[in-house]
Amino acid sequence: MGLHFSVLASGSTGNMLYVGTDEKKLLVDAGLSGKATEALFKQAELNINDVSGILVTHEHSDHIKGLGVLARKYDLPVYANEKTWNAMEHLIGNIPTDQKFIFSVGDVKTFGDIEVESFGVSHDAAEPMFYAFHNNNRKLALITDTGYVSDRMKGVIKGANAFVFESNHDVEMLRMGRYPWSIKRRILSDVGHVCNEDAALAMADVITDETKHIYLAHLSLDNNMKELARMSVSQVLEEKGFGVGEAFEIHDTDPKMPTKIQYV
């Protein structure tokens, strides 16, 4: 079994990604309660006791809600950059010092046979960052919670065999929706979230012949729909000359249901 993953949950109510190999299993974020997380692991037919560490992207509650509980219950080391630690420590409760580790932006760390590269994104958090996972010339890239995708970010994630990529909102749905203008402005800003079309334009710059799977992630429950996101992204990519459904597959994610285990 090579590098594989499951998007356990994705959306504004909670985010978690499982990444593993035969040798090592990791969790990125813990945005649901401990009980909900355990239920998702069972649903995905994964064993939470196999997880050997949690990587944190940033301190927003939909990414750390269950972090303290899981770290304490399963004696898991937690990795985050210094600014994120400072921002979230009062939110997650006490975690023993020997379980707290610094993973700085731009660093590369090795966990068993998985090499993990972190990179900064543009979001209204202390120092948000996401990850690219490498194993035996296979690569998985995770990028959500960013207002735009810069050339620097693209440089890290380009050529991944699989992407978990933010496709947060449809701009028209957001503009016409019930959110107050202050929240709309925040989502549309450079430190907010990427819309369907902008996500697709960024994808067009990082997809290569090696890319086989794209998972559309962090969809807004109020300002997007799975079918709309998939259609919008597919349309832009097809206009750019990509063979959606032939060269690679586009997949949905869900806030309450894990995706099937996908090998990279």
Swiss-Prot record:
Residues the entry annotates as binding a divalent metal cation 2: D62, H63, D145
Keyword Metal-binding: yes
UniProt-annotated binding residues for a divalent metal cation 1: H58, H60
Summary of the knockout phenotype: Significantly increases mutation frequency; this frequency is increased further in a mutS mutant background.
Key words, A-Z: Exonuclease, Hydrolase, Metal-binding, Nuclease
Effect noted on mutating D29N: Significantly increases mutation frequency
InterPro entries recorded: Metallo-B-lactamas, RibonucZ/Hydroxyglut_hydro, WalJ_YycJ_ExoDNase_sf
Phenotype when changing T144A: Moderately increases mutation frequency
Cofactor comment: Binds 2 metal ions per subunit. The endogenous metal is unknown.
Effect caused by changing D124N: Moderately increases mutation frequency
Leading EC class: hydrolase
Pfam family, one: Lactamase_B_2
EC number(s) recorded for this UniProt protein: 3.1.11.-
Known cofactor(s): Fe(2+); Zn(2+); Mn(2+)
Any GO MF annotation of the entry: metal ion binding
Functional description taken from the UniProt entry: 5'->3' double-stranded DNA exonuclease. May play a role in mutation mismatch repair (MMR). Required for accurate coordination of cell division with DNA replication. May play a role in cell wall metabolism.
Family the entry assigns: Belongs to the metallo-beta-lactamase superfamily.
Protein name: Exodeoxyribonuclease YycJ
